[in-house]
Regions:
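Short amphipathic alpha-helix that is part of the acyltransferase structural core
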Residues: 1-31
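Short loop/turn motifs at secondary-structure junctions and domain boundaries
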Residues: 36-42
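Conserved beta-strand in the GNAT
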Residues: 47, 53-62, 67-74
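Active-site beta-strand termini and strand-to-loop segments that position acidic
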Residues: 49-51, 161-162
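Conserved acetyl-CoA-binding loop-helix of GNAT-fold acetyltransferases
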Residues: 75, 81-94, 118
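Conserved GNAT acetyl-CoA-binding A-motif
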Residues: 96-109
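Conserved active-site alpha-helix within GNAT-family acetyltransferase domains
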Residues: 109-144
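C-terminal "cap" of GNAT-fold acetyltransferases
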Residues: 133-164
C-alpha cells in the first residue's frame, strides 16, 4: 500500500471534518472537537492520506522547557497495522524533532493491553509510570468512550524518551 504522508497545517473545513471522522471512529464522540485540529504556533499536525482521503493523524505539542508531547496519534481501523502510525512518527522525528528535546506520550491501557506500546517502544520511548484512571471523570461525560462498559476501565501509561 502506498501512503502519502503529508505535513500540513489543517485549515480547510473539509479536511478538519475528515480528521474528526477518523477521531470519532477511534476514540468516540466528542473526544476531539473542531478546534483541536486548528494548529497554534506551538503545535504540529502530520496527516496520512491514502488516495486523497485522510486515514491518520499525529498531533504534536511543543511545550516549554524543551519538552514535546505526542498529544494524539490515530489511524483509521481499516488502515491499522500497515505502518502508517510508524511513518507518521518517523516523519516527525526526521523533519521536526531536536535531539535536545525530551518527548512523552500517554497510552491507553485497557483489558486488551496497552495501546501503542510497541509503537512507542519502536521509537525508544519507555513506559515509565502508570498514571491510573485519569480520564475517569470525563469518560462518557465530555466524550463517549468506545471502551467503557459499566465504568471507566482505561488507565494512562506514561511513555517517555529523554533528550540526548
Amino acid at each position: 500500500m502506498e501512503t502519502e504522508i503529508a505535513f500540513m497545517e489543517v485549515i480547510h473545513p473539509q479536511q478538519i471534518e475528515e480528521l474528526l471522522s477518523v477521531s470519532k471512529s477511534l476514540f468516540g464522540s466528542n473526544y476531539h472537537e473542531y478546534h483541536y485540529f486548528k494548529c497554534t504556533t506551538n503545535e504540529l499536525i502530520i496527516t496520512a492520506r491514502f488516495k486523497s482521503k485522510f486515514v491518520g493523524f499525529l498531533k504534536i505539542i511543543f511545550e516549554k522547557g524543551n519538552s514535546v508531547k505526542i498529544d494524539c496519534i490515530g489511524v483509521s481501523k481499516n488502515f491499522q497495522r500497515k505502518g502508517i502510525a510508524s511513518n507518521l512518527l518517523y516523519h516527525y522525528f526526521q523533519n521536526h524533532h531536536s535531539q535536545t528535546n525530551g518527548i512523552y506520550a500517554l497510552a491507553w491501557k485497557t483489558s486488551s493491553g496497552i495501546h501503542a506500546k510497541k509503537l512507542f517502544q519502536k521509537f525508544e520511548m519507555k513506559g515509565v509510570k502508570n498514571l491510573g484512571q485519569i480520564w475517569k471523570n470525563k469518560c462518557n461525560i465530555d466524550f463517549q468512550c468506545p471502551y467503557k462498559s459499566n465504568r471507566c476501565n482505561c488507565e494512562a501509561i506514561l511513555f517517555k524518551r529523554d533528550s540526548i
